[in-house]
């Protein structure tokens, strides 16, 4: 059964790319990106089991507006956005160096036997990391 897309009811323009960060697994290995969501609402971050989309959906518009004015949050946010952009366009990667002719032909590998993160439910009926779900 397909899952409904997560709608974030309100996101101030100044931090509008939070949704983009939340939908890119980049946040799961980038410490500063995870810190953004932790700062946004630490109890909710834990309650949602570190699911940034669910957290954005459940965060009060007033809290989002407050973060959009907070200089510490904005400095961290701007750094995360810059890192995300660098990673998306950086030609200085192993793949780009080893396979320059394939730079514009990305590769995706999907296997339902591996769990990416608990916020990305993949159910295959197999054992492994998903067996506890």
Predicted regions: what they are:
Residues 1-133:
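Catalytic cores of glycan-processing enzymes that make or break glycosidic bonds
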């Amino acid at each position: 059964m397909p899952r409904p897309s997560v709608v974030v009811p309100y996101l101030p323009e100044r931090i509008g790319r939070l949704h983009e960060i939340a939908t890119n697994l980049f946040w799961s290995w980038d410490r500063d990106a995870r810190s953004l969501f932790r700062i946004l609402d630490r109890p909710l971050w834990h309650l949602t089991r570190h699911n940034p989309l669910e957290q954005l959906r459940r965060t009060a518009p007033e809290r989002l507006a407050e973060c959009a004015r907070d200089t510490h949050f904005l400095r961290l946010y701007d750094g995360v956005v810059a890192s995300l952009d660098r990673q998306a366009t950086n030609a200085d990667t192993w793949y780009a160096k080893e396979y320059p002719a394939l730079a514009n032909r990305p590769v995706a590998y999907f296997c339902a036997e591996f769990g990416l993160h608990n916020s990305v439910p993949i159910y295959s009926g197999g054992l492994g990391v998903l067996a506890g779900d």
